[in-house]
From Swiss-Prot:
Gene3D superfamilies in alphabetical order: 3.40.140.20, Methylglyoxal synthase-like domain
Enzyme nomenclature, EC number: 2.1.2.3, 3.5.4.10
Signal peptide range in chain numbering: none
Pathway membership, UniProt: Purine metabolism; IMP biosynthesis via de novo pathway; 5-formamido-1-(5-phospho-D-ribosyl)imidazole-4-carboxamide from 5-amino-1-(5-phospho-D-ribosyl)imidazole-4-carboxamide (10-formyl THF route): step 1/1; Purine metabolism; IMP biosynthesis via de novo pathway; IMP from 5-formamido-1-(5-phospho-D-ribosyl)imidazole-4-carboxamide: step 1/1
Keyword Hydrolase: yes
Catalytic activity entry: (6R)-10-formyltetrahydrofolate + 5-amino-1-(5-phospho-beta-D-ribosyl)imidazole-4-carboxamide = 5-formamido-1-(5-phospho-D-ribosyl)imidazole-4-carboxamide + (6S)-5,6,7,8-tetrahydrofolate; IMP + H2O = 5-formamido-1-(5-phospho-D-ribosyl)imidazole-4-carboxamide
Protein family: Belongs to the PurH family.
Protein name: Bifunctional purine biosynthesis protein PurH
GO BP annotations listed: 'de novo' IMP biosynthetic process
Gene Ontology cellular component annotations, sorted alphabetically: cytosol
Domain MGS-like: 1-147
InterPro entries hit by this protein: AICAR_Tfase_dup_dom_sf (IPR024051), Cytidine_deaminase-like (IPR016193), MGS-like_dom (IPR011607), MGS-like_dom_sf (IPR036914), PurH-like (IPR002695)
Lineage: Bacteria, Pseudomonadati, Pseudomonadota, Betaproteobacteria, Nitrosomonadales
Domain comment (free text): The IMP cyclohydrolase activity resides in the N-terminal region.
Length: 528
């Protein structure tokens, strides 16, 4: 145990710092501080010594040089167990500093502002703070280093139980957290500055990217039992994203549960109307809109009852008791909704293994992050990473082009836009038959588009669903007319696709021959 006798506190985020400093003062700890933090302490009656008075060297360069002094870093780096260190410090008049409490200039928050300039960013690069944190973290055997307000109460609790001391285990854990914070901070600076070109313009893909992830949990195993796995989140997760989920009940989430739950949640939250999405192996096997969650679920389940067994079910509106009763009649791995009524939760209490997740819907805004979406997607390849801007493109009726002689009715257009939205979340090659606000057949992941079309039609037939008058979405263009021939024979009346094939004329002619409506979006939604 190391008793805390002297602490240096210098924070930008002053959350909880008054209470923490008062508690230290009650232990008889001498408090050193700088600038605004010192003023805050004085104004609240907490005894404090300004760092400039302690070092005998004034702050200079608009506060850029405050703590970069041998009396500070010597007090942090000197090892108490080495006689030569102790002798040197005594000769130089350098006392020990047993604790520092430092959080850094808000660089990340500054550059996150849309109006932030390069000058703003530079002025928010902390120098003295990280230097002190590194010194203290290196000498964790003797010094406790706190870098976040969330650490205050735990440290105080230990000090209260030990008469004002911290344990070696606590100091080591604080040291690791401190180095993680410095790494993340420097990574954010590197990422931001690397994104600038020589002429001052920004580059979407900087010369170096520093991955900054935080472990959420270890997993029992990976995609298969022989693989090890863990779940990590972004340092600053988007509101309404899967990692913000609260698990209300059920077994621990598996690797596959998480992957499938993300696919279901991303799809369902793209709808404004009440919707239900059922996912199996990261592919939607049933999607529907309804006046109520119950109606949406019943319609989604009709698409493919066989595949829905053991699936992931997601809703974008509060799940009520009626919908919960219906869902509870089938085997479900994970259930997701923004909220649940008390009646719904009571239903699932009898199904203790069902993993019930609650995720608040994103607040919305101009950026993908504010809408709960990734701004970029990554994919690992051999010793490398592919990075692309995320596929967050959405279309409306104003963005489409009718390329056939026949024009869509309002009802057809509504079904086509619904089908197009679903197809975006189906693995390529993707074909989706829809009608009346629900999927009727889904063909996913085939190497040829015509095979996906045939499979989607067979799925509908197996489920006893008629495709007469249905709408079809294809995530990419039809390379030949054969896919159009198959969907027309199945009963479709209209189709939406990107267009762009060298055989577009042939494909459009086939649609005209069958009396179909065909719409081009000029946007492709490959998903691999």
């Amino acid at each position: 145990m190391a008793v805390i006798k002297r602490a240096l506190i210098s924070v930008s985020d002053k959350t909880g710092i008054l209470e923490f400093a008062k508690a230290l003062a009650e232990f008889g700890v001498e408090i050193l501080s700088t600038g605004g933090t010192a003023k805050l302490f004085r104004d609240n009656g907490i005894p404090v010594t300004e760092v400039s008075d302690y070092t005998g060297f004034p702050e200079m360069l608009d506060g850029r040089v405050k703590t970069l002094h041998p009396k500070i870093h010597g007090g942090l780096l000197g090892r108490r167990d080495l006689p030569e260190h102790v002798t040197a410090m005594q000769a130089a008049g350098i006392p020990d500093i047993d604790m520092i409490v430092v959080n850094l200039y808000p660089f990340e928050a500054t550059v996150a502002r849309p109006d932030a300039t390069l000058e703003d960013a530079i002025e928010n690069i902390d120098i003295g703070g990280p230097a002190m944190v590194r010194s203290a973290a290196k000498n964790w055997q003797d010094v406790a280093v706190l870098t976040d307000a969330s650490q205050y109460e735990e440290v105080l609790a230990e000090m209260r139980s030990t008469g004002g001391a911290t344990s070696k285990a606590t100091r080591f854990a604080l040291s690791v957290a401190a180095f993680n914070r410095i790494s993340n901070y420097d990574g954010a600076i590197s990422d931001y500055l690397s994104s600038f070109n020589a002429d001052g313009t920004r580059n979407e893909f900087p010369g170096q990217i520093n991955g900054r992830l935080v472990k959420v949990q270890d997993l029992r195993y990976g995609e298969n039992p022989h693989q090890q796995a863990a779940f990590y989140r972004d340092l600053y997760p988007a509101p309404g994203s899967l990692v913000t989920a609260q698990q209300l009940q059920g077994k621990e989430l598996s690797y596959n549960n998480i992957a499938d739950a993300d696919a279901a949640w991303e799809c369902v939250k793209s709808f404004d109307s009440t919707a239900c999405v059922i996912v199996k192996h990261a592919n939607p096997c049933g999607v529907a809109l309804g006046a109520t969650p119950l109606e949406a679920y019943q319609k989604a389940f009709q698409t493919d009852p066989t595949s829905a067994f053991g699936g992931i079910i997601a809703f974008n509106h509060t799940l009520d008791g009626a919908a919960a009763e219906a869902v509870s009649k089938q085997f479900v791995e994970v259930l997701i909704a923004p909220d649940y009524t008390e009646e719904a939760l009571a239903v699932f209490k009898a199904k203790a293994n069902v993993r019930v997740l609650k995720i608040a819907l994103p607040v919305g805004g101009d950026s993908p992050w504010s809408r709960g979406r990734n701004s970029h997607d990554t994919k690992r390849v051999g010793s490398g990473v592919l990075i692309q801007t995320a596929d967050n493109h959405e279309i409306s009726a104003a963005d489409i082009k009718v390329v056939t002689k026949k024009q869509p009715t309002p009802e057809q257009l509504e079904d086509l836009l619904f089908a197009w939205r679903v197809a975006k979340y189906v693995k390529s090659n993707a074909i989706v038959f829809c009608g009346n606000g629900m999927t009727l057949g889904v063909g996913a992941g085939q190497m040829s588009r015509v095979d996906s079309t045939r499979i989607a039609a067979i799925k509908a037939q197996n489920a006893g669903l008629s495709l007469q008058g249905s709408a079809v979405a294809s995530d990419a263009f039809f390379p030949f007319r054969d896919g159009v021939d198959v969907l027309a024979e199945a009963g479709a009346s209209c189709v939406i696709q990107p267009g762009g094939s060298i055989r577009d004329d042939e494909v459009i002619a086939a649609a005209d021959e069958h009396g179909l409506v065909m719409i081009f979006t000029n946007i492709r939604h490959f998903r691999h």
